[in-house]
Amino acid sequence: MAEIIGIDLGTTNSCVAVMEGGKVRVIENAEGSRTTPSIVAYTKDGEVLVGASAKRQAVTNADRTLYAIKRLIGRRFDDNVVQKDIKMVPYKIIKADNGDAWVEVKDKEGKSQKLAPPQISAQVLIKMKKTAEDYLGHEVKDAVITVPAYFNDSQRQATKDAGKIAGLNVKRIINEPTAAALAYGMDKKKGDRKIAVYDLGGGTFDISIIEIAEVDGEHQFEVLATNGDTFLGGEDFDLRLIDYLAGEFKKDEGVDLHNDPLALQRLKEAAEKAKIELSSSQQTDVNLPYITADASGPKHLNIRLTRAKLESLVEDLVERTIEPCKVAIKDAGLKVSEIDDVILVGGQTRMPKVQEAVKNFFGKEARKDVNPDEAVAIGAAIQGAVLSGEVKDVLLLDVTPLSLGIETLGGVMTKLIEKNTTIPTKANQVFSTADDNQTAVTVHVLQGEREMASANKSLGRFDLSDIPPAPRGVPQIEVTFDIDANGILHVSAKDKATGKEQSIVIKASSGLSDEEVEKMVKDAEAHRDSDRKFHELVDARNQADAMIHAAEKSVKDLGSEVSADEKSAIEKAVNELKEAMKGNDKDAIEAKTKALTEHSSKLAERVYAKKGGAAGAPPGGEAEGEPQAQAGGKKEDVVDAEFEEVKDEKKKDEDK
């Protein structure tokens, strides 16, 4: 069976891994990094940039550079957390027709295009898919994608949609802390252990209590409880620092940088860099020359920042992570002292203040043998290997993070499945009508812990009609909730008297319709085709440039030996090629390049002969001859060096 890759689709960074020959390999991207910034940029030329290239141009293209999109996935525009984010990001968050939070960017014609968060996240997944394909040498179709444990049903569904848009068959959605536990526990076979996975990433916080046990020779990972906050992460730490720096600058210079998207983007980059530096040093300088200007001239920002100051700015954010830890321990039915190991996941856990808070709560140092940036992708790859059958002795028992139920008489939520129930699971309950002769009931599906229905997350609603008229309380309506292994909910309602049944797979009451997802899949495929054509055009231009350089160099080297006719023909061919390069017609550029090659090939041979090519080139002659060899089309003389990558595992064996 083909490999199933593991993807950690993160708020700030993403990572991809695959299991090969029993070992998990985290795959480097085209830039040589093991993690890729989860940033997507739409340039003024219509190109889509993903990762480091998108991050590099963020300052000059702030309103089209989209980051932390995971915080919007599966969210309503009117959510308080979304409203808070709108004020802090340089790009435009809008209300979609279905009430979701979407993003608006300008296309290359300057027209507004509306993008759904799954559509943007799909671009990051396409990059991860391509990274894996480049390494494996063949197409990849199947993937396991991770989500925060505390993601609700609509956020999970939106993540699955993103995978589909990216051309991936999402075999499983698994929780990030569970994946990290797999990465940690796979090679630890002795005895039962209870571990706490504290996952503070770029945009979300999760805590999971997991028991690792040996059961009948199987390595069993059972999630006992999970809790968290899907709008608390490193981005919030950055925002505190940005606000502080902007406030200090306003005090000194009287200018509010929040009103300047360009300055705000530079400030964001500087704040992130300063935060990282303060994890290893006690103080740092934030120095941004020419950050803005007013009538009196340019303004420069130069502020000294200490670790103590940063810690005071984010103290309450660190404290906010402790309450979910208390709830998770209580829900797991354990005491803090019964936790054997604490695993830290997510880049923000590198902050000493966070590590100190974790140590104070759990009464022990966290493990340092898990890479916080890579553990989740490694765990996803292990789960992929379990699903493909490559790994056979692992059983993963995950849970649903929030209770699920329906709205009943008086606006009350009646729970059918309690939080922290092991999935997959199924539950049913019989309800009845509230009025005499009622012929239809509306099943309103809810997710959350509050008694009042309106205070919980609405996942969707559907009607069961054609109920035979009867006094209230007589009809028997059986409602069944079925959660699959991805944590996605299927609900059905059945009239026991008539056998009539109505069911839905819960998509968020917002969410993308199947038609919208299919359209986005086609758009993404079309974009991949246009990207391929763009790269082919760039290659053609590069070859044309090299040909022009080689031809002009040949004319210069031969000097008076070039006849007027030859010179005129080459100049004409060069000018025609330069004209073709101004356009976007790849075929025209290639045709003119070929014409110039034919004109200049004889000159190239004469240059080579003149420099001693015929009588044996002097030292250095080969290097000088390279462009001419190209120009003359003598490719058979140039042999590409063949090499193969030595895999880490082989290398280790050789070193022994």
Curated annotation (Swiss-Prot):
Alphabetized InterPro entries for the sequence: ATPase_NBD (IPR043129), Chaperone_DnaK (IPR012725), Heat_shock_70_CS (IPR018181), HSP70_C_sf (IPR029048), HSP70_peptide-bd_sf (IPR029047), Hsp_70_fam (IPR013126)
GO cellular component: cytosol; plasma membrane
Keywords carried by this UniProt record: ATP-binding, Cell membrane, Chaperone, Cytoplasm, Membrane, Nucleotide-binding, Phosphoprotein, Stress response
Biased composition, class Basic and acidic residues, residue ranges: 647-656
Residues bearing PTM Phosphothreonine: T204
The keyword Nucleotide-binding belongs to this UniProt entry's keyword annotation: yes
SUPFAM superfamilies: Actin-like ATPase domain, Heat shock protein 70kD (HSP70), C-terminal subdomain, Heat shock protein 70kD (HSP70), peptide-binding domain
Keyword set includes Cytoplasm: yes
Localisation: Cytoplasm; Cell membrane
Paired cysteines (S-S): none
Inducing stimuli: By heat shock and acidic conditions.
Xref: PROSITE patterns: HSP70_1 (PS00297), HSP70_2 (PS00329), HSP70_3 (PS01036)
Compositional bias (Low complexity): 620-632
Topology within the bilayer: Peripheral membrane protein
Pfam family, one: HSP70
GO biological process per UniProt: chaperone cofactor-dependent protein refolding; protein refolding
Principal subcellular localisation of the protein: cytoplasm
Domain of life: Bacteria
GO MF: ATP binding; ATP hydrolysis activity; ATP-dependent protein folding chaperone; heat shock protein binding; protein folding chaperone; unfolded protein binding
Primary role: Acts as a chaperone. Might have a role in the infectious process.
Family listed: Belongs to the heat shock protein 70 family.
NCBIfam families linked: PRK00290.1, PRK05183.1, prok_dnaK
Record protein name field: Chaperone protein DnaK
Source organism: Coxiella burnetii (strain RSA 493 / Nine Mile phase I)
